[in-house]
Design a protein with these regions (language model features):
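Basic, alpha-helical nucleic-acid-binding regions used in initiation and control of genome expression
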Residues: 1-257
Length: 257
């Protein structure tokens, strides 16, 4: 039985509005939905459970569906299923809704949860890029998620980017020393270096461990909506370790400090 969609945008709730907004922004601006493909699939799965979209899963694609859309970067098919709204009018309405979400304890806790998830995902995305740059398997980037779970430490997105860069560079150094390619050993070296870096970076023991992107605007719709509309973080989305204090501080005060 198909789920009954919410009646209005207000009934979506914060995560639902953010996820639907990311899908709409992605298709309107030709950006990826979320930092990683795994997170994108999770977002689309949540939207399907809410009855807002249809997807062909478990089949990869519909053979013939005139109403089907396709995400511009990930190439995932979907169909709009929410009869209460016209798709073209949703993106600005969802941005307005996200900006209006109150800063009560519940909403701040939701923002913090989403920020923490995005920080790790942005680190994983950068890790993928670094691994590909050195001709390693980009799927190794999922090891960052395991390191995060294991260590239980909070880093900023920029600090995760630094750790990913340093670990990949260590792996590249070992690979150059090998007479015969040994990808399994290189992966373990990278994993070990990633684990080794996290503690000193989180404690502030080392300096210059924050890699800010050249373009501070996130290249995924989910992170951009979070940084620019659900919060007032802006470029501090990358620089700050997720915390309630950072979310509650006025933007002007954060920039002054």
């Amino acid at each position: 039985m198909a789920p009954t969609p919410p009646a209005t945008i207000d009934d979506l709730g914060l995560p639902g509005a953010l996820y639907l907004g990311a899908l709409m922004e992605s298709c309107g601006r030709r950006t990826r939905i979320a930092p990683t493909r795994r997170m994108t699939l999770a977002v689309m799965g949540q939207l399907r459970e809410l009855g807002l979209i249809d997807v062909p899963w478990p089949e990869p694609r519909w053979e013939a569906s005139p109403e089907a859309c396709e995400t511009p970067i990930e190439g995932l098919q979907w169909r709009f299923a929410w009869q209460a709204y016209e798709p073209d009018a949703l993106a600005p309405a969802l941005r307005d809704y996200l900006q209006s979400v109150p800063r009560d304890d519940f909403a701040v806790a939701l923002r913090l949860k989403i920020w923490r998830e995005l920080v790790v995902a942005e680190g994983e995305r950068y890790f993928e890029a670094q691994l590909s740059k050195h001709q390693f398997d980009p799927s190794w980037a999922q090891d960052l998620v395991f390191v995060h779970r294991e260590c239980g430490l909070e880093l900023s997105a920029a600090q995760w980017r630094y750790c990913a860069w340093a670990a990949t560079r260590q792996g590249a150094s070992i690979a150059q020393q090998q007479r015969l390619p040994d990808p399994a050993r290189v992966r373990e070296v990278i994993f070990a270096e990633l684990r080794r870096r996290v503690g000193p970076v989180a404690s502030g023991q080392w300096t210059n461990t924050s890699f800010m992107p050249f373009n501070a605007r996130p290249d995924s719709a989910l992170s951009a909506l979070f940084a620019e509309h659900l919060t007032t973080l802006g470029e501090l989305f990358w620089a700050l370790v997720p915390s309630e204090l950072a979310l509650l501080a006025p933007a002007r005060a954060r920039h002054v400090s």
